[in-house]
């Protein structure tokens, strides 16, 4: 199992990999983890900055001779170069591993954008810089044309990995359309941490959260793509409070000031507890009634799956990924503005039992033993190494 992120490193992909490995081992599979030096895997050496990632993995494969190599893939995790001028120069530091490895490869894809969402990233422009706000038009122009020229390159990096894998896995139909029809959909695993609490009241008591309000949770990494700015504009409905907890990813260099969130409203509770371990993360989800996902862009959301696994419906931006799960009655999508999100909270409250019942049925598909069994089925379907 290869992932540059792995606990105790902070990161959603690392958390996903850890839980999947644990579940696969519970099924009796021998799983060895290759990751970064900061992670507690069985082998190390992988890094977004290591140009020798392929050689590191090839050496590990030669040493342990596995039946399957399972790659948790997101281009930036292994180092990616997107050349807008010469596409042949675009690559990741894991490309040659895919070409040279004779052991069957299974690849789980963690990102895959359609053209509209890929281009929308060019609108996420920082206001600071050498020219300050006056440099925004220039920064936008550079970023816009860079994204325009690199979209097909980004898609090709994923497509190449799929073509060179025995099997590809994605988390949704949206990602299936983006990555390729040769993939299999296995929902992102998520499950409450094993702990004994009597319910929402006790969870709130442990976390010192109010008992007399409904709570909507906004949690994730401090990045502009998460849409945190919307929180300061929202008119939070009567009887509700918004609980916020943000953190910085292990590899993140983005600086995002969250101080503005609590300056406007006493209906926003900023926990400021950084990246939560499994127990506390689960406890926080138990304490809340809904999750807010005002994302500007996304191709997947581990937070959404985690919330669903705790029986919590969502209110999300009207992005294609979220729409897919809203159509299953697991939450709602709205226009990304303060009025729509406020109305979305009210809609969830009015029909809470409907959404809650749908979520309770769906979350069985997210349990890690179920997800691991699906992967075992993928592994078992692979008959022989590549020639």
Please name every model-derived segment:
Residues 92-100, 124-167:
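Membrane-proximal helix-turn-helix segments that form the acceptor-binding/catalytic region
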Residues 190, 219, 241-257, 274:
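Glycosyltransferase donor-sugar binding loop
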Residues 195-209:
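A short helix/loop element that forms part of the nucleotide-sugar donor recognition site in Leloir-type
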Residues 210-226, 232-236, 243:
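Conserved donor-binding/catalytic core segment of Leloir-type glycosyltransferases
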Residues 246, 255-282:
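Nucleotide-activated donor-binding/catalytic signature segment of Leloir-type glycosyltransferases, i.e.
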Residues 290, 313-316:
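Short hydrophobic beta-strand element within catalytic cores of glycosyltransferases
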Residues 328-339, 345-352:
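Conserved acidic donor-binding segment of nucleotide-sugar-dependent glycosyltransferases
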Residues 352-381:
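A charged, aromatic-enriched C-terminal amphipathic alpha-helix characteristic of glycosyltransferases
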């Amino acid at each position: 199992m290869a992932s540059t992120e792995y606990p105790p490193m902070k990161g959603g992909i690392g958390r996903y990999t850890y839980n999947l490995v644990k579940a696969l081992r519970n099924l009796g599979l021998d799983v060895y983890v290759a990751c970064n030096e900061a992670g507690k895997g069985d082998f190390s050496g992988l890094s977004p900055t290591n140009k020798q990632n392929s050689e590191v993995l090839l050496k590990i494969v030669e040493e342990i001779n596995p039946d399957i190599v399972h790659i948790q893939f997101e281009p930036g995790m292994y180092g990616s170069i997107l050349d807008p001028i010469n596409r042949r120069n675009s690559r990741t530091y894991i490309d040659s591993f895919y070409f040279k490895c004779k052991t069957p490869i299974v690849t789980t894809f963690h990102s895959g954008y359609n053209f509209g969402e890929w281009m929308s990233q060019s609108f996420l422009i920082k206001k600071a810089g050498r020219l300050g706000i006056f440099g925004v038009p220039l920064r936008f122009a550079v970023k816009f044309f860079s994204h325009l020229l690199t979209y097909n390159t980004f898609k090709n990096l994923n497509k190449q990995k799929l073509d060179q894998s025995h099997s590809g896995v994605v988390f949704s139909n949206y990602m299936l359309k983006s990555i390729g029809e040769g993939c299999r959909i296995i929902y992102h695993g998520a499950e409450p941490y094993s702990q004994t609490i009597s319910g929402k009241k006790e969870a709130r008591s442990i976390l010192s959260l109010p008992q007399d309000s409904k709570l909507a949770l906004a949690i994730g990494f401090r990045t502009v793509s998460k849409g945190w700015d919307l929180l300061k504009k929202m008119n939070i409905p009567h009887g509700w409070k918004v609980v916020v907890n943000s953190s910085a990813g292990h590899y993140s260099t983005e600086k995002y000031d969250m101080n503005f969130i609590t300056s406007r409203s006493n209906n926003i509770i900023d926990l400021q507890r950084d990246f939560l371990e499994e127990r506390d993360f689960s406890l926080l989800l138990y304490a809340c009634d809904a999750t807010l996902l005002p994302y500007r862009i996304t191709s997947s959301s581990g937070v959404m799956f985690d919330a669903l696994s705790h029986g919590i419906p969502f209110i999300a931006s009207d992005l294609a990924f979220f729409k897919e799960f809203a159509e299953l009655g697991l939450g709602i999508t709205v226009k990304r503005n303060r009025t729509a999100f406020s109305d979305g909270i009210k809609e969830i409250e009015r029909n809470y039992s409907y959404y809650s019942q749908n979520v309770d049925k769906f979350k069985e598909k997210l349990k890690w033993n179920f997800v691991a069994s699906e992967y075992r089925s993928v592994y078992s379907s692979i008959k022989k190494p590549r020639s």
